[in-house]
Structures are given as structure tokens and as C-alpha cells.
Design a protein with these regions (language model features):
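Acidic, surface-exposed loops and disordered segments
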Residues: 1-274
Length: 274
């Protein structure tokens, strides 16, 4: 597979994976790809913990599902991320960013305009939306054959210092290498983010994984092989839309947006789902 093809096909997997274990060969390839990422002064600040134990995965899935339910029930999630929610194709076409909630139960569709109001939050809780989403999230994580914890060396990751930026930047490059490699291997990947949204929940995962004091747990991902047909959850979104080049590229200085690049280049095809 060509690199540009993998970049264009890269996506986040919102649905379930096949139950098949990820082969050790593929695990090694993924982590080799991560280790080949660039880093400031070749510091290689990243560390990874590979998780296959069903009990550990089950415990993390419980923490993730409970976190999602809580963050959505109390409104903190919607308040924090409301600039990125889209409920119509027209809005997505205008903004060209965020998440388009294009799959919703019929009972909820009339209330999308109220989702960020107190009444909307009450309605969602009445309909059990946070609980439904939390349980679906738990099942997705629990059904994943492989989790990957991403850590940084605290001797390099020192918040408030320039080394912290370098470390996070390097970690991002390592994770992008993994993400692109999943495309080549017929796999999917998704960030397990909700435990970071609720105070105390991330600490539970840190304890569960026995992360030592000299490392900082930065992220946890779920990975697995993709089924031939991917089933979408009851409430789902798409995020394939991308900003036009003239919206994020400038020429010579920041007063001059790039011109003539808004049309997709030859061979680009349609963007990936996320």
C-alpha cells in the first residue's frame, strides 16, 4: 500500500472489532512503527504497555463506560465540546470540522436543537441516552482484543518546560505511525478518552496498569481487526469532512491564504470516515 493511500484511508473505528487476537507479528510491526517516529534529539520519550488480559480489558471497559455515562449525564461533556457537534449536513458543509451526528434514534431527532440546553440535557437523561452510550462504549472496549497504553518518560515530559512540548509532539508522531500502520494491517483503532473526562477515573487505570512514578500515562487506545461489514452503534457520528486548503494553508505570510488548492488533487478520492 502506498503511504498517501494509507493517509487518505486512515480513520477512527467507532464500531466493534473482530474477536480474533492481534497476532504477535502485527503487534511487533505496530510498535516498531511507533519506535521509528522522530523525536527531539532522538530522545524517544514514548513508552507503551500492550494489554491483552481479558480481565484487565474488562476493568478498563467498565471504567470507560461509567465515565461516559457520568460525563454525559451531568452535561460536562456537551458543555466542553459543543463547538464540535453538528446535527445537519448543511452545518457540517459550512464548518467543515467537528462530528456530524447522522445516526440517531427517531425519538431523539426532534430534540437536537435543544441538546445544549438544560431542557435538552433533562430530555436526554429521561430517554437514557447517557446510559445507552455508556453501555455501548463499555461493550466496544470489552470486545477489543488489544488495548495499548501510551506513556511518556517524566524525565522528558515536564509540563511547563519546552521538553514537554517536544515529548508530546514526538508521541503524536509515534501514534500517527501506529494509526497509519493499522490501515496496512486491516485493523482499526480508537482512543479511549472518557476516563480522562471524569475526575479520578484515569487514576484507576494508572493503578490498574501499575504505571511507575517515572512514567506518565497519556492515552489508552483499543485496537483489533476490522469485520467485513462494520455495524454502526445506535448513536453514531461521521467526521470525514476536512477544511479546504485555503482555510488552513497560507502562502509566504499569514495574510495570504493558499489559492488554487481547494479541489482534491488527482487520485485523492473521497476522504476517510474520520
Amino acid at each position: 500500500m502506498e503511504l498517501l493511500d494509507a493517509i487518505r484511508r486512515r480513520k477512527t473505528t467507532n464500531g466493534p472489532f473482530l474477536p480474533d487476537p492481534v497476532s504477535e507479528e502485527h503487534q511487533r510491526i505496530l510498535l516498531e512503527a511507533a519506535g521509528r517516529a522522530p523525536s527531539q534529539l532522538n530522545s524517544q520519550p514514548w513508552r507503551f504497555v500492550v494489554i491483552e488480559n481479558p480481565d484487565t480489558i474488562s476493568q478498563i471497559s467498565r471504567i470507560s463506560g461509567e465515565s461516559m455515562t457520568e460525563a454525559m449525564s451531568n452535561g460536562t461533556f456537551f458543555e466542553r465540546y459543543k463547538p464540535y457537534f453538528r446535527f445537519s449536513q448543511a452545518e457540517m458543509d459550512e464548518k467543515r470540522s467537528g462530528m456530524l451526528f447522522d445516526k440517531l434514534p427517531a425519538a431523539l431527532r426532534p430534540f437536537t436543537s435543544q441538546v445544549f440546553t438544560k431542557r435538552g440535557q433533562k430530555l436526554m437523561n429521561t430517554f437514557g441516552v447517557p446510559k445507552t452510550l455508556g453501555e455501548e462504549n463499555r461493550k466496544l472496549v470489552a470486545g477489543s482484543p488489544l488495548l495499548l497504553g501510551v506513556m511518556l518518560d517524566r524525565s522528558e515530559y515536564r509540563p511547563g518546560q519546552l521538553s514537554s512540548f517536544y515529548s508530546v509532539f514526538s508521541m503524536g508522531a509515534a501514534m500517527e505511525n501506529i494509526w497509519l500502520t493499522t490501515v496496512e494491517l486491516g485493523m482499526g483503532i480508537q482512543f479511549i478518552s472518557f476516563p480522562m473526562e471524569v475526575p479520578g477515573q484515569w487514576d484507576e487505570i494508572v493503578k490498574l496498569l501499575r504505571v511507575p512514578d517515572d512514567l506518565e500515562l497519556m492515552a489508552v487506545y483499543r485496537l483489533g481487526y476490522l469485520p467485513p461489514e462494520q455495524r454502526r452503534p445506535a448513536i453514531d457520528w461521521s467526521s470525514h469532512q476536512r477544511k479546504l486548503a485555503s482555510q488552513y494553508v497560507f502562502r509566504e505570510n499569514c495574510d495570504e491564504p493558499q489559492q488554487g488548492w481547494d479541489a482534491p488533487p488527482p487520485g485523492a478520492g473521497a476522504p476517510g470516515p474520520s
